[in-house]
Amino acid sequence: MWAVLIMVVMVALGGWYGWPAEQRREAVVRQQADDDAGTMAVYREAVMAYFKANNVTDTSVSLAGLKGAGVLPAWSKLATSPTVAWTNYRDGAGQIYIFPAAAGARPIVAELLALSRNSLNVGVYRAADHTLFSPVDGTRIALPTLGDAVIPDGAPVWLAQAPCD
């Protein structure tokens, strides 16, 4: 009987002490997702500024190209990073696509929607039907073939248009 009581108390204490650690882990994951979304927003703004100054289509711009053009803010992690988690493509119609450079990116669509104020230009790419699924209202935007750029299935995508002068 005493063994059962001691075991119950030990399990309860283990759960009690483990609960804050799980909350801290979840807070760290949320913060990392917020950071990734913020970095993607800065990257998107830099790409838009680059294509405003360089009116080229059916291409993408590298991180080195963005740095060389001086469109990355000096305070941004992107300005000092040798690599970036994001890439881009501008199609012939001038539409800009911002998406992860590789598969396996963290799920950050909720954070992107918060940053974009629930814009329909933010969504999840569905490779099966080549659409951008918007979780805001369930719409699907058909995406064209992006030259040699490949958007990973299930990746967050943020559309943009280079501003006109």
Located regions from the model:
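N-terminal single-pass transmembrane signal-anchor helix
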Residues: M1-Q23
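Intrinsic disorder/low-complexity segments enriched in polar/charged and small flexible residues
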Residues: V4, G18-A21, K77, N88, ...
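Short, functional N-terminal and low-complexity linear motifs
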Residues: M7-G15, R30-D35, S76-A79
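Amphipathic alpha-helical segments typified by the pilin-like N-terminal helix
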Residues: W19-A37
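N-terminal alpha-helical signal peptides/signal-anchor transmembrane segments
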Residues: A33-D58
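Extracellular/periplasmic head regions of type IV pilus-like filament subunits
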Residues: K52-L120
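Short, surface-exposed interaction loops/tails
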Residues: P100-D165
